């Protein structure tokens, strides 16, 4: 399949290279999730209303019994962390959603007639209300929309808490309706994305289409440079051949990748 920059045919790519990029992005997202977990895995018990308690509490023991990695040492900060903790977790989750949303956009685009790189089963498409030739990629469109919704949550949380002074305020109650659905929403998003990717069909031999021949222009430039032609001259020669319709592909897709 062709690779794109600026939505223009750039260089040869492959299904493995394309999907592998998203796999690697998700591994980076996992690092953010781990960091968010570590920042959240602190014991706030004993902070009471935000200024500690005179009760003889063993905070180290409760930290160990409840499985926290450590404790919040400052009672005021334990309360100030409300909203901050939720925003940190939501940001990590939104990073996963952003990756999934970009993949969904690719799939919507690559499924369209103008690209035609992937084919979706009928169970993942719907017909048009009046155009019988259309099969719309509804599943990936909804994945994209739900991913964008999750991406907006960190800002929603920030706007609830951003100008609060020190201490607890009832404003924080609004976090619950924003934050709690996040976990099920992302899990559902990952489940349906997994199903969709597993059931889509990647078309083969895409690069044999003459439309994508210019994608091999870089290899042709490199070949001429290796024969002693200055890069600038080789670049201009190949560009002129493409402009005048005389460019011929010599490199194979295997050699290029």
State what each model feature region is:
Residues 4-6, 22, 51, 117, ...:
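Aromatic side chains
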Residues 8, 39, 64, 79, ...:
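Residue-identity detector for glutamine
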Residues 1-6, 73:
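Short, flexible active-site-proximal loops enriched in glycine and acidic residues
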Residues 125-257:
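Catalytic-core signal marking the mid-to-C-terminal active-site face
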Residues 11-160:
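Internal glycine-rich alpha/beta core junctions
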